[in-house]
Amino acid sequence: MRDNETYPKTMDRDANLPVDCPQPFRLLLEALKESRIRHCHWKSNIRLEESLRGKEDLDLLVDRAEEEAFYQIVQQSGFKLAQSASNCGHPGVFHAFALDEAGARLLHLHAYFQVVTGDSVVKAYRFPIEADLLDSNCQKLGVPVPTPEAELALFVLRMALKHTSVLELALVARGYQSVVDELMVLQAAADRDAAAALWCRWVPDSNPEMFNDALRAIGDPRALGQRITAGLRVASRVRGNRRMGALAVIVERWRRAGLMVHHRLLDRRNARPMDGGAVIALVGPKASGKSTLGGRLTRTFGRHLDVRHVHVGKPPATLLTMLPRAAIPLARKVFPGERSGEYEKPERRASGSYSLLHVLNMTMLAYDRRALLKRCAAAAASGAIVVTDRYPSKTVGAIDSSRFDDASLSACRPGLKRWLMEREQALYRGLPEPDLVIRLNVTPALAVARDEQRVKEDGPDASAVLRRWEMETLGSFGDVPVVEIDTRASLGESVVLLAKEAWAVIRPAMTPA
């Protein structure tokens, strides 16, 4: 029987959403309630409060008959659909994300139109039990949830099927105490006999004894052998619910495991916006916060999505330029007048005189920068979000842009140097354009003060900050949208503004592909 003390605490029908529930989640759940779309938060309700506060995914099961109306509400609530970058999705399931502007973080909606579950990686089983989960009058924190009996029966079924392969055993073993804790809460809230009856309806040729055996094994962290036995028994009973053949499941499981390792090594996520990614360029004077804010934006979006952070001002060398660029530092020591900073001085720029070494360096830099930006554009076209520190403008002489104007070219005699200058100009023509430029503004005095606090090899250099000011602020980007953010505000306020502008450029897909 239900524990009368635990049940009201876990299934309080009168509770409302947490006060600090982020606005997109609040809009979504209130719209679903108003439209009377059948839905429930169908699993892991022990952590529902954390989900409603945006700390966990929100796992909603929705009546498939309301699919079209649900998609409309999802988008009206500010969510944008995402898909797996490596074909690791599941049928009848989709992901969507919205920006919590107050917290500068992404919220994750994990929506189901059908119950596909079982193992953690492939979710190889399809159980037609949606009605048993949706037909409930129970609520928790203002959100519909299954009855305690349905949630207990489903939890035991899910956990048993997670003990049927070596990979699954390794995954479920991590933090297994949380499984035991959740089971204890569910047992206290549910009528075990009613849960066993549901289990017997869902699992062919089973009985209450099988349910109780599985429940006891799952509740004992030391009973690994019993859990494996229970899992294999359950798997044999529900093989008719497999959505894939046994061999296909094994192959797919290890394919996905390999991709998980690959993404972990690259420190990337598998999800991408369904309607394509974007290249978001951060530009501005030195010490305006480009690297700091770019890193924060990458971590904010990269917690859930495939996000790349690249430094266009310092592109990696390509095969063609690797050896000559490796010799540049030595050449600068031998010829101090060839340092980049020397050519940034107003009098040197006004002279229009450039050495062959400098022209060669600028041409190689243009070549490497173009190669990097083409890779960025390709990644964005495939759905990745690319955040760049700096970006070439259309203004000759601006930082990270073409250094040689037509006057300099005309003043140079025909030969290798002029040919390289022409190549440099050509490399900057027709570059892939960013989807959005965010120009970070700061006063010269504050930029100098910030530079003094930075730990750098050559130490603070106020003259360099002021010298580069014009070069870093005069760039024009043609028809590309440019948003300006004043970074004199606190870091937290700047991150909020940056995340809002960056998220706005991601296009929302109307429905899953």
Descriptions of predicted regions:
Residues 2-56, 62-278:
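Conserved NTP-donor binding/palm subdomain of two-metal-ion nucleotidyltransferases/polymerases, i.e.
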Residues 224-253, 444-513:
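NTP-dependent small-molecule kinase module
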Residues 290:
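Conserved lysine of the Walker
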Residues 303-320:
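Short beta-strand-centered segment that lines the nucleotide-binding/catalytic pocket of NTP-utilizing
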